[in-house]
Amino acid sequence: LGDVYKRQDIYVGTSVRDVTKADYSYILNHDVITEQLSAKLVPTSLPKRMLADGSYEALPQSEPVDTDYSAIGNIDPSLTEGVAPGQRAIPYFRFADGMAKNGSHDIMDVVEGRITLDEFVSELSIDDLIHLLGGQPNTGVANTFGIGNMPEYGIPSVMTADGPAGVRIAPEVGICTTAFPCSTLLACTWNPDVLEAVGRAGGEELKENNLALWLTPAICIHRSPLCGRNFEYYSEDPFVTGKLAGAMVRGIQSNNVGATVKHFALNNKETNRKNSDSRVSERAAREIYLKAFEMIVKDENPWAIMSSYNMINGYRASESEDLLTGILRDEWGYEGMVTSDWWTCGEHYKETNAGNDLKMGNGYPDRVKKAYDKGAISRSEMETSVKRILGLILKLD
């Protein structure tokens, strides 16, 4: 991954305005491998990278991939901008008929231990699997859509809620929730107990309004003060971000509702946010932009991760197998659900293949079915993602 200084200075304090350089030294006379990793997120169009001494090193270039390629033809761009599942999902909306479909089991058989989740999912049809891979219409006070929604199998509609500074419910609903300080201000406390208390209170409000998945915390790094979503993010420091946002996750999930850590990853620009390319060296990606995510995944086990709109070194984050499978699952051991951000430009079947389990705010069942018929996605890939989605639902009270 490159050259580093042989010496690092350590500062100790309670804030950036109150730090002291530690009067301490430690000499290591031999190399020690603390963790061995494989090449992931390799740059394709990054001409150089900065070394620890401030000099630059040239990087090899490769031919960029066609991010719009699809085995079933390019998607209509109008379908990637705010199409609500309430409009698209009417033919797929499920109403219970009182019996498990085709005489098979329902989800309560899994809950009560009569069959395993693997056995239950194996009984679902291809159309059933595809249905579960996409977002579902709002119910109750929700306005960011939900997951599940297959009553004939006993699978409920489980609703999400946005809100970087409190649980967001539309004003016309007539329900008020607490407006907490934004993430940047909370991070200025340097106090995990405060963040955990905010998360616990927000999780309680989520639960009392029959919502199950809070689309927070957002933990991308403050790379530039001009990023339009900096107020949602915590800090320019990965360690501060990981510790404090981790406490937020811990507080939220103490209510048996889910936190959604986002935007995974390197989402540092709002202009052209769905097609911008975050070009970064592997070392910078791991040590700066992915570190807070790694800390939270390993320490707090968030129920969900949200992939980001942007590309990373030429690949859409939501279609990046390196990111969503190689790093997140294989290296960090994550076992939860990954959802896309709402209406990404990624192709649904390609996202599923990469490890992005859920397409929000709606799925594209016709396109996934077409991809399946052409052999571009397998039943096994769909089952893997559906088990993660249902696994989240099964955690709820």
What would you call each of these model-derived segments?
Residues L1-G2, Q8-V12, V16-D18, A39-D397:
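Glycoside hydrolase catalytic-domain context in secreted enzymes
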Residues D18-L37:
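Short beta-strand elements
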